[in-house]
């Protein structure tokens, strides 16, 4: 399951990722509908979801701030919102790397991804 941060909803990323990702692609607001979700509430929501990979551009609040957990993966994309359309390709490249190829390999990891490095 791929879970998009709510700040990525207006970019059409769900459909772009769903073109190549075989599992569920959703957003964080679907995990707790009709509520405001603070950044602090996201890890507990991810723990309750089935093997999620959370995708965000909010590097400041998630990279090296959230404690890794074997029940989820967080992919922090260090790209400005004006380049959010690059995220599906970067995510696909991330999933091609050995430590991220399968759910079981990526769970428990928090990655910071840019155009140049993971």
Can you describe what each PLM-predicted range is?
Residues 1-6, 10-21, 40, 62-118:
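Acidic, PIN/NYN-like endoribonuclease modules and their adjacent C-terminal/linker elements
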Residues 39, 46-68:
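Acidic, metal-binding active-site segment of PIN/NYN-like and related structure-specific nucleases
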Residues 21-22, 50:
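Proline-centered flexible-loop/turn and helix-kink motifs
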Residues 28-30, 57, 77, 113:
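Conserved beta-strand termini and adjacent loop/short-helix elements that scaffold enzyme active sites
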Residues 44-47, 96:
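Surface-exposed alpha-helical segments enriched in charged/polar residues
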Residues 32-41:
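Short helix-initiation/N-cap motifs at beta->coil->alpha
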Residues 23-33:
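A short beta-strand-loop structural module common to alpha/beta enzyme folds
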